[in-house]
């Protein structure tokens, strides 16, 4: 009798399990993307979709470095497949950005950036990379120059005395010299003025949000114009070895003193200097907002400009800023070039220079692209490691939208979204613009739970 009871119980349990399995089976869900219990549209791509979307390129650096079988499709390596003996890279050849998320030590550089850089070298793409340890520069600087024929520039903020130069006024000086040799070529003068304005805007807005200026907007705008005017004066009249940003600071500081002589009451020496220029000189026009104001306001404008230039007063930084740029924006866009930026973790006060260089190079690249019909002849990439630790980049979200159509790709690498929220964008809308303008989000984290959380955050809250 006991055995019969046990048998009945076991049959009942098995029957209940079978019934529950049938009721809650996934077979009852129709083959639809949404609308039958699913949330969101995210799903895994099929093999056919992967094959149709990406270029499949045999990844063979040994042959590439010998000049054999070089790939022709420029783009980002977003995946791979293959066996132990051969690897095929999956390359997106479109104008896309990629957001890399990974905690320290998970292999962001070794397992993803190195293949991307190797492929960029093989296809002739110019690139800029930021690095805290200097590994990228040490491992790929010589390879890029020796095997792929690249122009190399290393801006090493850890060892400035061993660094290449990066004169912010390089392009202004270049076109001012060309204009003085050919006074009839107004296009050279126009380019010098354009790059002077780019430098001034980059310096004034570096690490700041123009929307937060409020009632002080006049002083920042006028300081930008005054800075543009001074840069033009330095490029036009100073000796070649003195045409750099430190000279701009020294001139503004010295000309802040009151003017001497009769008829100069209430004026400073900057205003007196401007009176010596012809009326049609653009430097006089750029500084117009500051010149045509009260004495106290004029002093405030000049003090604002000086305060934005204070960061450049460093004996080590001057070893970089006071010498000619190895690779300017035009050479970067038109020739195979690689710029390695090394930022010291032990001295974060120098990080502003990285943000400044990125912003200036970006704005100058847009200018080069506009001169070539709106697109660069050769695709360029910014590999921005530790993007989240850099000082705030003004209108960072606009960089992602404006650069894409110009054939400039940006690859920001962060450790978490909290970094972007803290340093780059304070408004949720701007953060979403950066995420949504990054067509790829590469997640590489140590724990599966954390990785699932990030993937869920990127795809949708209910996917």
Where are these regions (language model features)?
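Disordered, low-complexity tails and leader-like regions
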Residues: 6-7, 147, 440
């Amino acid at each position: 009798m006991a055995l019969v009871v046990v048998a009945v119980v076991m049959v009942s349990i098995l029957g209940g399990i079978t019934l529950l399995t049938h009721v809650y089976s996934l077979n009852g869900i129709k083959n639809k993307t949404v609308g039958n219990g699913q949330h969101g549209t995210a799903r895994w791509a099929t093999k056919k979709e992967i094959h149709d979307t990406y270029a499949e390129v045999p990844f063979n650096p040994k042959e590439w470095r010998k000049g054999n079988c070089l790939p022709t499709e420029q783009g980002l390596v977003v995946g791979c497949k293959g066996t132990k003996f051969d690897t095929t890279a999956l390359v997106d050849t479109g104008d896309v950005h990629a957001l890399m998320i990974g905690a320290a030590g998970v292999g962001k550089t070794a397992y993803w950036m190195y293949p991307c850089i190797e492929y960029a070298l093989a296809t002739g793409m110019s690139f800029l990379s930021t690095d805290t340890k200097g590994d990228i520069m040490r491992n790929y600087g010589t390879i890029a120059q020796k095997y792929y024929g690249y122009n190399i520039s290393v801006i090493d903020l850890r060892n400035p005395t061993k660094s290449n130069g990066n004169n912010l006024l390089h392009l202004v000086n270049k076109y001012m010299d060309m204009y003085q040799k050919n006074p009839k070529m107004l296009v050279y003068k126009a380019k010098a003025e354009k790059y002077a304005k780019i430098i001034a805007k980059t310096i004034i807005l570096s690490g700041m949000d123009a929307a937060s200026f409020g009632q002080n907007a006049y002083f920042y705008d006028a300081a930008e114009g005054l800075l543009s005017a001074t840069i033009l004066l330095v490029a036009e009249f100073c000796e070649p070895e003195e045409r750099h940003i430190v000279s701009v600071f020294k001139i503004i500081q010295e000309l802040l003193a009151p003017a001497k002589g009769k008829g100069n009451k209430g004026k400073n020496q900057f205003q007196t200097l401007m009176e010596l220029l012809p009326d049609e000189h653009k430097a006089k026009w750029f500084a117009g907002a500051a010149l045509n104001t009260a004495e106290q306001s004029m002093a405030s404008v000049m003090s604002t400009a000086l305060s934005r230039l204070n960061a450049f007063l460093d004996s080590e930084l001057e070893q970089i800023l006071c010498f000619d740029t190895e690779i300017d924006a035009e050479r970067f866009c038109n020739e195979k070039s690689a710029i390695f930026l090394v930022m010291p973790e032990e001295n974060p006060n120098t990080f502003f220079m990285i943000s400044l260089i990125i912003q200036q190079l970006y704005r100058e690249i847009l200018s080069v692209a506009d001169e070539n019909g709106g697109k660069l002849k050769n695709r360029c990439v910014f590999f921005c490691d530790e993007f989240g630790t850099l000082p705030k980049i003004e209108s960072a979200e606009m960089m992602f939208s404006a650069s894409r159509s110009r054939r400039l790709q940006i690859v920001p690498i962060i450790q978490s979204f909290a970094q972007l929220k803290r340093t780059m964008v304070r408004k949720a809308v701007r953060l979403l613009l950066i995420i949504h303008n990054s067509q790829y989000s590469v997640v590489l984290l140590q724990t599966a739970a954390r990785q699932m959380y990030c993937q869920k955050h990127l795809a949708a809250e209910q996917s």
